Amino acid sequence: MSSVSPIQIPSRLPLLLTHEGVLLPGSTMRTSVDSARNLQLVRSRLLKGTSLQSTILGVIPNTPDPASDAQDLPPLHRIGTAALAVQVVGSNWPKPHYTLLITGLCRFQIVQVLKEKPYPIAEVEQLDRLEEFPNTCKMREELGELSEQFYKYAVQLVEMLDMSVPAVAKLRRLLDSLPREALPDILTSIIRTSNKEKLQILDAVSLEERFKMTIPLLVRQIEGLKLLQKTRKPKQDDDKRVIAIRPIRRITHISGTLEDEDEDEDNDDIVMLEKKIRTSSMPEQAHKVCVKEIKRLKKMPQSMPEYALTRNYLELMVELPWNKSTTDRLDIRAARILLDNDHYAMEKLKKRVLEYLAVRQLKNNLKGPILCFVGPPGVGKTSVGRSVAKTLGREFHRIALGGVCDQSDIRGHRRTYVGSMPGRIINGLKTVGVNNPVFLLDEVDKLGKSLQGDPAAALLEVLDPEQNHNFTDHYLNVAFDLSQVLFIATANTTATIPAALLDRMEIIQVPGYTQEEKIEIAHRHLIPKQLEQHGLTPQQIQIPQVTTLDIITRYTREAGVRSLDRKLGAICRAVAVKVAEGQHKEAKLDRSDVTEREGCREHILEDEKPESISDTTDLALPPEMPILIDFHALKDILGPPMYEMEVSQRLSQPGVAIGLAWTPLGGEIMFVEASRMDGEGQLTLTGQLGDVMKESAHLAISWLRSNAKKYQLTNAFGSFDLLDNTDIHLHFPAGAVTKDGPSAGVTIVTCLASLFSGRLVRSDVAMTGEITLRGLVLPVGGIKDKVLAAHRAGLKQVIIPRRNEKDLEGIPGNVRQDLSFVTASCLDEVLNAAFDGGFTVKTRPGLLNSKL
């Protein structure tokens, strides 16, 4: 007797090619569709079809679809599964694709592929029919025994699970309600099997063969459950329910034939993770949190989104260096040598590092200081932080804070958010692997602020030695000790740093370099570095110190050495071109007449000194080594000089004075120009001035008007009222640059005094200081940078407030020798020093008055 399955499929089916899994009759699978042919199938057949027949597909397993429909169709698997598309979900991220929920109906065999584009369609033959066995009792008994044996193992497997779980109870009812012929396919799709084993079950057309192949799979799962029950400790009822819901996915098979290696490796990783938690040296609070999270992780299916989040959290917790630290090198003599070799000058900074080492020798549990290096760009603030770590023998990590405007970058995100991650502090500790590194917080003065919070406020806890031993990152949600971390912040100015944050840091000023210091730095560090980067040797290029001085004074004007480094790099590139061309010419000369070449070389070598690069421009022979970089070579390589000493030319008429200004880039000289014309007594100020500088200008003109008779200052009409029918225009050149601050007061007074007296201000004098309405000169900041700017500009005398005299101690000795300093407490002293011959009080012969 034979019977045919009631499921009838069309004789022609569109084919869905998949390699992610194997769909068996009676089971349901979710698959992603993103290849060209499969996308065409979904769009043309499923989304536009209106009949039930249009939703039936032929699913071909173990067959990847080519990415492009222009490629040939790969060899198709012989047996497939007719499936009903139950659900179609589309998405455009990260690329256009569909997710299909399909239910297997029956097996089929491909008879012939009818067409391949836009999607394959094949003529198929249905295979799932009830077979007619030979009419012998032996065969019937054999099939009956296989069926009973299969059913017995299936029931035994289900009864080992918790029947109170609805999913298990439903599976038990299915065993009693479904035909025995359908159970092998359904149970194979439920229990833990590999794709290869499912493919073998799919290819088993004979029902007897499917029974024989499925029974060993059931036995394996039963043995695995027994082993799990023996080795697993008693759990709470909730644990049993979770095991019962996903019983087969969690057991480890013992036959060794399972090829689902990803899940095995994942389970092994969880075991290793649990072992790391037990053996870690994290604090008790963190350990409790990890134990709680690992218990939750074991209960979760791997398909849950929270599974990956929890696992990432636990991996971070075991990787953090809770108690792992490096041993400090406390040899002060060796540290001094190392700092001197790495950096020239910076005596104040080196002194502070050596003091820290000395205190560490006396007290081992000293908390790390919070240092902040403040200075112009290019003076080596970042590199000196690396040298400090090298000196101490610690790990170094740099955190760039420029432009950071989200406090979560410091404190991390809470784990409730999608894509949450720890902050930069915790990430840095994970990277270095120790709990006492040197952290460089670069550009702390350029932190931003946004709706996501203020990162500067988040740094208050990090940079407070009294609080950072219990720093709590939002992602970790447990305290981490940062007290052993040596934090070094860098900034160009303290003006933009919040006061609360500034109060927590020890400020160390790193001023700009003098010309002599730049020359030493260039020949000790910059030139050797550039030679190495460009593949040159000292035997190929010679840069005298006088050439370096020319580069510093005529091609760069900065407090640091970055521009100097770039200019030296340009020189090395030009020399590299000459050297490479010379090698090419030598190769040509080797093939020419040797006698002629020797004669030419004797002619060229008449002068044995190193030749300049400009002398070798038109030679047919390779240049002689070393190539000398002189003034002419600089002009050929770098072009005409960018800066000239034009101070004396700009002070060739009255009404011009030189002031000194401080910027985040270092000190600068600043010209002040004044002119007068007939008018209505108005004061015009130009040059992008701030409110403070405008007030200084009004103060200056008021003081001069009140002392005009004393100094015999008159306007063009001979009146002591300087603004009577007279307009004054004050201009500060470099109008595109915003200027503000009180230190230009003395310069404005001197400029206006020169204008109304008709006398020239000395061209070699610069000045700085704040003024009052009574004519007092008040102290200002940035004296060292301002003095260095005057020295760079070639000036000879600097006028500063008397109360700033103490700041001259930080000026290098060679600069103090080149400059003379005048300390002034009032404007009378300033004017006397600014003009040749002084600016003494003038008196007119008094008129004889009589009462008669």
Swiss-Prot record:
Entry keyword annotation includes Chloroplast: no
Matches recorded under HAMAP family: lonp2_euk
Compartments, as annotated in UniProt: Peroxisome matrix
Gene: LONP2
Protein name: Lon protease homolog 2, peroxisomal
Superkingdom of origin organism: Eukaryota
Listed NCBIfam families: lon
Native organism: Homo sapiens (Human)
Lineage of the species this protein comes from: Eukaryota, Metazoa, Chordata, Craniata, Vertebrata
Molecular function in Gene Ontology: ATP binding; ATP hydrolysis activity; ATP-dependent peptidase activity; enzyme binding; peptidase activity; protease binding; serine-type endopeptidase activity
Main function: ATP-dependent serine protease that mediates the selective degradation of misfolded and unassembled polypeptides in the peroxisomal matrix. Necessary for type 2 peroxisome targeting signal (PTS2)-containing protein processing and facilitates peroxisome matrix protein import. May indirectly regulate peroxisomal fatty acid beta-oxidation through degradation of the self-processed forms of TYSND1.
Main localization (coarse): other
Active site positions, chain numbering: 743, 786
Subunit structure: Interacts with PEX5. Interacts with TYSND1. May interact with enzymes involved in beta-oxidation of fatty acids, including ACOX1/AOX.
Domain spans labelled Lon proteolytic: 651-837
Family of this protein: Belongs to the peptidase S16 family.
GO terms of biological process kind: peroxisome organization; protein import into peroxisome matrix; protein processing; protein quality control for misfolded or incompletely synthesized proteins; protein targeting to peroxisome; regulation of fatty acid beta-oxidation
Residues with the N-acetylserine modification: 2
Motif (Microbody targeting signal): 850-852
Domain Lon N-terminal: 13-222
Keywords: Acetylation, ATP-binding, Hydrolase, Nucleotide-binding, Peroxisome, Protease, Serine protease
